[in-house]
């Protein structure tokens, strides 16, 4: 029997006659709901088995035959009462999934081994049969509608033993299938650059949950982000190109119910932004005072109409008018100052099509005119052969850039290189000749600004190196005491200046002073002694230029 069901009344019988037969019985397992012993028949009772496997009680019945006051006990007989347990089924988790998803396989279990499970499904449209036995394999969930569909699965556990099937308490769980998310069709838009795109509010036919929307934009240059969620607010359309730009917006709906999001098929629409008239960028120019600018031919990427150009110049002193139309021809740049002058040229394009002029944004470029760098005056130098020159430090009045000084020397024999850059350090002057040597140094200031170098007007100065003064050899004289010497006239090979002479006499007793300048006139020689007297005259020449 099953736990909780009634055991049929047991009425003992016998073949004995001619007396009275009574019965006594014992029960070895009182857990089934029957006492341990009794006499007479066994009445109906409710079978009990609170365990998880069948319980069997053995009933031993002993007959006693009585006649004329004598009781005779006969052999006992046994029989069994088996009580099957009540099967159970473990709770099954509900499932919530999207149309087209695979369900999780359901494996039933319970406390009683050998239990089978019978189930019914009240909504076969989800893709599951109306009924079945055993576990439920994974299947593809189906919901072709617009609202969630929930199927209730009722599971009944059954334990069978001794050809007796015992059902347990049914349990239920649900499988809810969310619909495929949908988004309503969105109209395409065509707008102008700089104008507002109309707000886009997405809609759906789905109900019974929440539908959200995510979108992507394949062309962010129109002023809309690459992606977003929810509706698209009004935004200013952008097209910085020269032809219409079309962005394709792909919107994907997601339907959420019970915390499960289900993504539906995407839909697309377009936003087309027409361009604005434009002028191509113009390169800046940096040039030198007095040179020609590069002619400027304006251009545009716009097509399908005519683009004209008007321009204004904020610094006409560079040699260009204050305003004009069309291209700008080459002109001679002017800067009479000492620092760069920059003119800003602002160009406005006008695109005309069908008789309608459309003015686009302006663009600006600059023309910078570097000044002509001038070298400040440098003093000439006159030095002696072997003497040190004064270091020459160049300078200029030019500002706003870098000034470099390049110089050449037409007479490297003076001890200075034929050319160089920068200041000239002091050096030892050289002149191995007999006349002054003059070197002309030509220095050119080079002014650099904006990677453009501009040479100024060269300036010159001189370094004159006087020769080493010389005096020609003078013949020795031997004279008698009291006689006149021969006058001595000094001479030199030097030219190009004036050579003077100073002399000293180491023996004034001969009648000649101890020192003097210029030539030595004849004089009366004196020697009051008894032996010859020799005087040494040392002459020093000085060359002046």
Spell out what each predicted region is.
Residues 1-545:
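Extracellular low-complexity Ser/Thr/Asn/Gly-rich intrinsically disordered segments
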């Amino acid at each position: 029997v099953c736990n909780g069901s009634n055991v049929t009344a047991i009425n003992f019988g016998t073949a004995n006659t001619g007396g009275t037969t009574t019965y006594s019985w014992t029960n070895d397992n009182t857990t089934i709901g029957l006492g341990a012993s009794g006499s007479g028949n066994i009445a109906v009772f409710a079978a009990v088995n609170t365990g998880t496997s069948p319980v069997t009680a053995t009933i031993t019945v002993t007959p006693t035959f009585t006649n004329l006051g004598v009781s005779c006990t006969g052999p006992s007989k046994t029989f069994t009462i088996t009580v099957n347990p009540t099967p159970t089924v473990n709770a099954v988790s509900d499932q919530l999934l999207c149309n087209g998803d695979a369900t999780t396989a359901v494996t039933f279990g319970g406390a009683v081994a050998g239990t089978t499970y019978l189930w019914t499904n009240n909504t076969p449209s989800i893709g599951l049969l109306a009924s079945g036995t055993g576990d439920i394999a994974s299947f593809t969930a189906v919901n072709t509608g617009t609202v969630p569909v929930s199927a209730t699965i009722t599971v009944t556990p059954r334990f069978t033993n001794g050809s007796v099937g015992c059902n347990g308490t049914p349990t239920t769980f649900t499988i809810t299938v969310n619909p495929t998310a949908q988004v309503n069709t969105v109209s395409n838009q065509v707008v102008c650059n700089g104008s507002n795109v109309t707000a886009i509010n997405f809609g759906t036919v789905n109900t019974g949950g929440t539908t959200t929307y995510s979108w992507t934009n394949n062309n962010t240059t129109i002023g809309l982000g690459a992606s977003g969620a929810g509706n698209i607010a009004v935004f200013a359309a952008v097209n910085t190109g020269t032809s219409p730009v079309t962005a394709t917006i792909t919107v994907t709906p997601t339907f959420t119910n019970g915390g499960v999001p289900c993504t539906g098929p995407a839909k697309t629409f377009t936003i087309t932004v027409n361009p604005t008239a434009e002028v191509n960028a113009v390169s800046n120019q940096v040039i030198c005072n007095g040179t020609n600018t590069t002619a400027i031919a304006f251009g545009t990427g716009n097509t399908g109409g005519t683009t004209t150009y008007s321009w204004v110049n904020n610094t006409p002193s560079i040699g260009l008018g204050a305003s004009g139309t069309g291209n700008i021809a080459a002109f001679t740049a002017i800067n009479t100052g000492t620092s760069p002058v920059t003119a800003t040229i602002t160009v406005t394009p006008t695109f005309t099509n069908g008789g309608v002029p459309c003015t686009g944004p302006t663009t600006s470029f600059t023309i910078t005119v570097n000044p002509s760098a001038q070298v400040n005056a440098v003093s000439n130098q006159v030095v002696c052969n072997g003497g040190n020159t004064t270091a020459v430090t160049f300078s200029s009045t030019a500002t706003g850039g870098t000034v470099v000084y390049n110089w050449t020397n037409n007479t490297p024999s003076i001890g200075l290189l034929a050319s160089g850059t920068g200041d000239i350090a002091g050096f030892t002057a050289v002149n191995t000749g007999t006349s002054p040597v003059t070197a002309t140094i030509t220095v050119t200031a080079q002014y650099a600004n904006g990677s453009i170098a501009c040479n100024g007007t060269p300036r010159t100065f001189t370094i004159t190196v006087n020769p080493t003064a010389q005096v020609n050899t003078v013949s020795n004289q031997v004279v008698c005491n009291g006689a006149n010497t021969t006058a001595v006239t000094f001479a030199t090979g030097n030219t190009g200046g004036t050579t003077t002479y100073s002399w000293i006499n180491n023996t004034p007793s001969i009648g000649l002073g101890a020192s003097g300048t210029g030539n030595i006139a004849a004089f009366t020689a004196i020697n009051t002694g008894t032996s010859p007297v020799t005087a040494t005259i040392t002459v020093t020449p000085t060359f002046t230029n």
